[in-house]
Amino acid sequence: MVKETPLHSSSSTSLSSLFRPTKLKNLSAKIFNGGGNQSYSKTDDVSRSSSRSSKKNTDSDQEDQIKYNKPNDRRSTIGKSPQGNGALSKESHVVASSTLTGISPTSAKKAPIDYSPSRPLPNNHNPVRTGHTVPHLPHSIHNPINYIHQGSKDAFHHPHPVRSTAHSNISTVSSAKSDTPSSNLSYQAHMHPVEILQKQIEDKHFMDSQASTPGSVELQHNSSSGSDDTSSRKKKSLRLTRFFKKIHNDYHDNHHHHHHHNRGSTPTKPKLNLNTNENIVESNGKALYETDNPVELLEKYGIPGRKLGEGASGSVSVVERTDGKLFACKMFRKPHLNNEGTNQSQLANYSKKVTTEFCIGSTLHHENIVETLDMLTEGDTYLLVMEYAPYDFFNLVMSNLMTQDEVNCYFKQLCHGVNYLHSMGLAHRDLKLDNCVVTKDGILKLIDFGSAVVFQYPYEDTIVKSHGIVGSDPYLAPELLKQTSYDPRVADVWSIAIIFYCMVLKRFPWKAPKKSFNSFRLFTEEPEDEDDIVRGPNKILRLLPRHSRTIIGRMLALEPKQRVLMNDVVKDDWLVSVPSCEVDPTSGDLVEKPKNHKHHLVTEEELNELTKQHGNKDSN
C-alpha cells in the first residue's frame, strides 16, 4: 500500500481553501471569471489511472466470491431519488488552478473555447450528444496542457510539442527539492484533465500538511481491487433488487412531487455535525448534521432535507436553497479508524477517493450525466453537491408503467451518456439501474462515479486496462471474474445490455455471470442449431424486441474483443431510429418530445401505492 501525506484540515473549511489563503468559503472549482485579470493555471502531475496502480487480483480460487469496490452503493454519490428539477446555472466550467481565488457562479462569465486541436483521440469522432462545453484553459508556465471538449469533435487537445518522459502509474511529489511541491516540478504533458484537478487538490493538501519528511510521497490512485469486501449476494430469485440501502421515508413524504413548497414558514436552522457518522433526525423528518460553523453550507445551498438514501461510503440528502432551487448533497462517511498507526493512511485513502470522485464528476458536462457542482469540507468530512433530479430510475422500471417506446427512449439516452463518457477517456464501471435518475422532462442521467477510471489519456492511443471486480453481480461482464485485467469500455457495454434486459423484462437474466448459475451456463453453450432457444444467445435475445436483438447480441458477446464499442452502438440503425427526448444544452429546456410515448414518472410513495393496489388485486 502506497502512502499519501495525511490531511490536516481545520475543523470547518471548504475545499476552495485549497486555492485560497484566506478563510475558506467553498470550491466552485469549475467557474471561470472571464472578466477578471486573474491568472489561471493547472499545477502539477497527478496520479495515473487506477487501473495502472491497482493491485492485481491473483486469487483464482476465490473466483466465486465476488468483491465490490463499492457494494450496495446505489445512492452513495448522487441523489437517491427523488432528486430535483432545479435547472443548472449555465455558466461555463473549467478546472480551478492553485492560484484561483473565490469566484461565485453568479458572477462568472463564459470563457472562450479553443478550436485548434492538433490531434484528437481515435475515439473522439463519435456522435456524442453534449450538454455543455468545457472552455479553453489558458496556457501558463505551469500549464503546458490545453484541455477542451467541443461536442463530438475533440475531447482532448494537446498543443504542447514535448511528450512526457515520466509515465508513472503513481504520481510522485518530491519535497526534497523545495518546500512546496509545486514550486520546482516538471509537469506531465500527457495527463487527463481529471488528474490535473486531482493533483491540484493533492498539492494543496501536501502544502497544508505540516509534514516535512524528505523524499517522495506516493499517492495511490483510486484503488479498484475491491477492498470493500462484501460476500456474494444470495437471492431467492432473479427479481430486480436494489444494491443500496434505501431510505423509504423519503423527501416526498413532506413535499409534493411538483415541488410546491410552503414559503410562509421559516425553517429552523439545523445543527450540523459533519464529523459524526450518525445523523440526528427530528420528528419532522429533517436529517440534521452538527457542526460549529454550518453557515457556509446553509448560506450557499440551504438546509439539508430528508435523507434520500445511503450506501457504503456515505448518505445523500436533498437541500433547498432560499430561492427554492434543490440540490443533492452527499456526505461521505469517514472510515472507522482501527489504530493510531493506520489512521493517517486510512484518512489519506479516504480523502483520495472522495476528491477523485469530485474531479471526475466536475469534468463531465452532458445532458445525460448529472452535474457535479461543488465540494465542501468540514474537518475530515466532505460534502459533494450535485444537480438534483426528482425520479429514481429503479422505481420507474419497477412501476411496470413503461411502454416499449419509453424503454427505448431511456436506453438511447443511456447509450449517449456512456458514449460521451468513453469519448472523454473515462469508464464508469458500475452501470446499473440504481445509478440512473430521471428529470421531470424524462431525461435520464448517470450518477455515481466513485468507481470510474481513466482508460485513455490525451494524445495517446493506448487503452489502459482495469483491475479488480467492481460493480454488482448481475450487471458484471464475465471477464471480470476470470481475468486479472480487462478493458473497462466493453465491461460498460455489457452492463448497458443487462440494463436494457432488466427494463424490458423486469428481472435479471442471471444472478451473476458464472457458469455455476444454470441460466448463464446455458447462455454460454453452443446452440444445437439456429432455432435452439435453450442454449446460446437466443436464450436471452428471443425475449427482447426484434429490432433490438442485433445490437444487444453484439453488446453481450462473451469474448471481450468481439464486443461492440459504444461509438458503434450509437450508430446502430435501430438505435438511431429510436425517437428520444433531448434538451437544449444552453437553456436546459426540452427541445424534442417524441409523439410516440410519454414518460410515466412516479415517486417512491406512488410506487408503494401501486404495489399495494397490485397486491390487493392478486389477493382477490
Swiss-Prot record:
Q: Where is the composition biased (Polar residues)?
A: 95-107, 165-186, 210-222
Q: PTM Phosphoserine: at which residues? A: S60, S216
This enzyme catalyses: L-seryl-[protein] + ATP = O-phospho-L-seryl-[protein] + ADP + H(+); L-threonyl-[protein] + ATP = O-phospho-L-threonyl-[protein] + ADP + H(+)
Its Enzyme Commission number(s) read 2.7.11.1
**Matching InterPro entries, A to Z?**
Kinase-like_dom_sf, Prot_kinase_dom, Protein_kinase_ATP_BS, Ser/Thr_kinase_AS
Biased composition, class Basic and acidic residues, residue ranges: 56-76
Enzyme class name: transferase
Q: Say if the entry is tagged with keyword Oxidoreductase.
A: no
Bias (Basic residues) ranges: 254-263
Q: Which residues carry this modification: Phosphothreonine?
A: T58
Q: What is this protein called?
A: Probable serine/threonine-protein kinase RTK1
Q: What is the species of this protein?
A: Saccharomyces cerevisiae (strain ATCC 204508 / S288c) (Baker's yeast)
Taxonomy, top ranks, is:
Eukaryota, Fungi, Dikarya, Ascomycota, Saccharomycotina
Q: Which gene encodes it?
A: RTK1
